[in-house]
Amino acid sequence: DVYKRQGMLRSLKAMDAALGALRDVLPPGAFTVKCRLGYETPDEFERILPVIASHSPDRVCIHARTVREGYRSPVHPEWVKWAAGMLKCPVVANGNIVDAATAEAWVRLARPAGLMIGRAALRNPWIFSQLHSRFQGHPAADLTFRNVLHYIRRLYERTREMQEHYVEEKHIHRMKKYLVYTARGLPDTFDHYMKRAKTARDFMRICEDILD
């Protein structure tokens, strides 16, 4: 059976079998488990964590929300802290880490071994350097529109290189999807004109006119 959208959280028997099979074939150090707290309510994690622990994972990453809670509800750091005290392996926290303040709150409230950043990195690709500066006790450098322009240029070229068959119009459409996240906080004119670009030349001209 294939379990979609964290559906395995509803069947501890299926989870137990899958984790056991993975543990049997993965070499030491390679077995990481990532999960949410449960499907409906956070207290389901009390039953889920012992199943995970029984297979001696090398690390566990916890998105501290349930499936039903999606991505918009508050996170539950107390469950990550509980897991860190129960497991013998490193526990990594995930969920709503969008800037230095939320990262510091996670460290203070849950004391995880590490942090996993997902969607926030699409909106703010500089978050990693910002967190590094904050945890080193240094102020983060202020971002400029030129930083964003440099990022767009690199993203365009890198994603183009990854395509086996480059089609300009399709690539521009793909870039628009990426920049839906990054465009937040930029002038409204950027989003307005960027979405109307049809060619690579027009796309880059719009970016340069507004951001340079």
Predicted segments — roles?
Residues 11, 41, 72, 141-144, ...:
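Residue-level preference for long, well-ordered alpha-helices that form the structural scaffold
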Residues 34-40, 65-67, 96-98, 120:
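Active-site beta-loop-alpha junctions enriched in small/polar residues
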Residues 6-8, 15-23, 33-36, 40:
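Conserved beta-alpha-beta core of the PfkB/ribokinase-like small-molecule kinase fold
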Residues 9-13, 43, 74, 122:
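Residues at secondary-structure transition points
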Residues 9-12, 61-65, 70-72, 93-95:
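Catalytic beta/alpha-barrel core
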